[in-house]
């Protein structure tokens, strides 16, 4: 009985196996065939760089036929640099010229002949979205400011220094008066660099030095000493950058009253950062410290291994500092990134570094914007402030100055990422022209993808509608807190950090909702 049962089970199993196997074999063959002869949707693509305008019809045909032979589905046409930047290659097709558009037209027709598709970037070069049609007013904007110390108690009629202006473009946002207790200039210090290398045959001059431009460099343990004639109260340390240098933000701060006995103040911690980190300096807040001697110790030991923070100073630790500035006024820890002036992620400011007494309350700050009248840089402030010393903070915005740097004939300022009109203007003057300057019928068949590549245009933290968008999205008015964008603490450390986080959230949302969303909408309408 058991033997018969086993035979029946075996027979049923064999029958089931023979029923399934052909399907499995057929499916396996199908997958293999699909891999060897993929559908158009599954075919790989490649980048097609047109370098320095060195492109010809013969070269276009050869390239595209090779792509077809290799089984590619298409290619992203991307011109890089112009004919003048690669003069040794004798390029003839400068971007935006009739010669260049003829090459684009020919490449589309050849791709159409071969059954290939094309994609193009949103601008000349590979980063990110700019061109010569973008004016400073239409470009990415940042908040800038200047400050002036005045005495209150009497009528003033003064002109204030204009903040930074890129290509003479600047617009005011607001003018504030903030009370200050001590308006004395920062004290001058004697600066000494000392080698701490233990290797006997290494001379100090070989390990730490200050060059003719004042840049301090070292590959070995060292310290930088600031010596003051009188005790100086330091609340923050501004590191002036000389290119990306992660090591400059790993200093251990020590202080002394006599130059012999030193006490620990703080170990500076670098912010998380991208490789494009040089638009702004980096300010580290410290507990208020009064001393005559400040030392900044550095050692390559303990450096974080190389990671997404693309800085060669992690792989080969070298200290490079253009300048250290010690300030007596309170500032939020690494406020430059928190204000959206540069992309960084830093530790929150601690209350022992910036206390409640160091933060301006809204009631202390006087808004003088309406009393500041005139045009451009000939505006005059007419006002009477209460007695005492006041800092006049003139805040405005200008272009960041970032361009699509890898471009050639189409190089220009990066468009305002918060303004749908400038995003459309960018699209209309580049990608849309690929249809207008060629055969539109062929272009619609071939040019099927719009490519938005590497974000290499720094940051943006303002435009004319930013305050309106902020209030709509966050539910409160940013304008009374505008000094926060200059690193000035307001209300409390917790409140300051929260508002700046809201600023960054608004920046992020506008980039997505305006820049990318608008490009997606108008891109779909074309391809």
Where are these regions (language model features)?
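Mature N-terminal segment immediately following signal peptide/propeptide cleavage
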Residues: 28-74
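The substrate-binding groove and active-site-proximal loops of carbohydrate-active enzymes
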Residues: 44-56, 86-102, 132, 238-240, ...
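Conserved small/polar residues in nucleotide/adenosyl-binding loops
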Residues: 525-527
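Carboxylate/His-rich catalytic cores and anion/metal-binding grooves
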Residues: 250, 447-482
């Amino acid at each position: 009985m058991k033997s018969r049962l086993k035979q029946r089970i075996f027979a049923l199993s064999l029958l089931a196996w023979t029923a399934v196997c052909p399907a499995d074999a057929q499916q396996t063959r199908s997958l293999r065939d699909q891999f060897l002869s993929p559908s158009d949707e599954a075919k790989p693509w490649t980048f097609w760089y047109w370098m320095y305008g060195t492109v010809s019809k013969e070269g276009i045909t050869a390239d595209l036929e090779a792509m077809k032979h290799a089984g590619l589905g298409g290619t992203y046409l991307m011109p890089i640099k112009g004919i003048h930047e690669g003069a040794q290659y004798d390029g003839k097709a400068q971007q935006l010229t009739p010669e260049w558009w003829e090459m684009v037209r020919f490449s589309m027709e050849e791709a159409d002949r071969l059954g290939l598709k094309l994609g193009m970037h949103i601008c000349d070069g590979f980063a990110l979205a700019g061109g010569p049609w973008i004016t400073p007013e239409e470009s990415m904007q940042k908040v800038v400011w200047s400050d002036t110390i005045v005495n209150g108690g009497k009528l003033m009629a003064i002109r204030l220094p204009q903040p930074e202006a890129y290509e003479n473009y600047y617009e005011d946002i607001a003018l504030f008066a903030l009370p200050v207790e001590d308006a004395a200039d920062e004290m001058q210090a004697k600066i000494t660099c000392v080698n701490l290398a233990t290797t006997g045959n290494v001379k100090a001059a070989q390990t730490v030095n200050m060059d003719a431009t004042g840049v301090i460099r070292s590959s070995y343990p060292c310290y930088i000493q600031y010596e003051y004639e009188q005790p100086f109260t330091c609340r923050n340390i501004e590191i002036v950058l000389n290119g990306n240098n992660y090591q400059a933000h790993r200093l251990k701060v020590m202080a002394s009253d006599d130059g012999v006995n030193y006490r620990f103040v703080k170990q500076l911690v670098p912010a998380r950062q991208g490789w494009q980190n040089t638009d702004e300096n980096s300010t580290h807040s410290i507990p208020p410290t009064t001393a005559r001697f400040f030392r900044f110790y550095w050692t390559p030991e303990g450096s974080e291994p190389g990671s997404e923070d693309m800085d060669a100073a992690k792989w080969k630790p070298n200290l490079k500092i253009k300048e250290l500035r010690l300030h007596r006024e309170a500032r939020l820890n690494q406020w430059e990134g928190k204000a959206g002036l540069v992309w960084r992620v830093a530790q929150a400011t601690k209350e022992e570094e910036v206390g409640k007494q160091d933060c301006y309350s809204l009631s202390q700050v006087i808004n003088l914007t309406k009393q500041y009248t005139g045009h451009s840089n000939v505006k005059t402030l007419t006002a009477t402030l209460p007695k005492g010393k006041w800092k006049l903070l003139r805040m405005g915005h200008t272009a960041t100055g970032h361009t699509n740097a890898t471009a050639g004939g189409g190089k220009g300022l990066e468009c305002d990422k918060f303004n749908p009109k400038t995003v459309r203007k960018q699209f209309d003057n580049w990608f849309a022209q690929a249809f207008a300057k060629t055969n539109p019928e062929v272009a619609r068949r071939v040019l099927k993808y719009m490519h938005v590549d590497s974000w290499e245009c720094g940051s943006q933290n303002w435009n004319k509608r930013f305050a309106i968008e902020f209030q709509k999205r966050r539910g409160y008015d940013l304008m009374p807190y505008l000094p926060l964008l200059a690193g000035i603490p307001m209300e409390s450390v917790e409140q300051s950090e929260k508002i700046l986080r809201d600023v960054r959230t608004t920046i992020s949302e506008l980039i997505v909702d305006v820049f990318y969303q608008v490009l997606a909408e108008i891109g779909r309408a074309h391809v």
